Amino acid sequence: MEEPNRILFVSQEIYPFLDVESPIRLRNRQLPEFFQSKGFETRTFMPKFGEINERRNQLHEVIRLSGINLIIADADHPLLIKVASIQAARIQIYFIDNDVYFHRRKGVVDADGVEYKDNDERCIFFARGTLETVKKLRWTPNVIYCSGWMAALVGLYVKKAYADTPFFENAKIVVSLDDQEYMTPFGTKFADKMLVDGVLQSDVRSVAGLPVAY
């Protein structure tokens, strides 16, 4: 029997978990719904921002997938995985959570509309956390669709850090960098923070020591 086509959706924002309805958030809900209706297997990931109401959206933690520590900027950051369903669309969403990076903070800006200084680390954590979870699920995507700047590093890690991982070796990467309004560049240490086993200085040389606009 032929293996089903599998698409991994890695999205910065999805409606209705983020309340404001926008074309980007609607698209990130509708794409998995459409492909699943056509017989594709899908998995969908997004950050668990603090503004997402866990009770209303019926999120619950998946203990068997949680508990990994990701080292970023020489500090350990526990990875928590939560899930919820969009019943009308018949799709399940996996949420990447961490008390410092996501759980207590709304979106990518603070209450005054100022972007968080560690958005670069949050971006790294989201990308690595998603791939570690897919690996734990032992799920092999044919296509990885990344929406938003917070998902943009997934391709780098798939091709470098996970180059020898069977689950990702044949995956095609599609990146949609949407026109999102927050544009403060990442700091000059972003390249160093991206480094993990498999990602070399030469892989990030083009942004080393520079502020990185996303």
Feature map (PLM): residue ranges:
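Catalytic cores of nucleotide-sugar-dependent glycosyltransferases that transfer UDP/GDP/TDP-activated
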Residues: M1-Y214
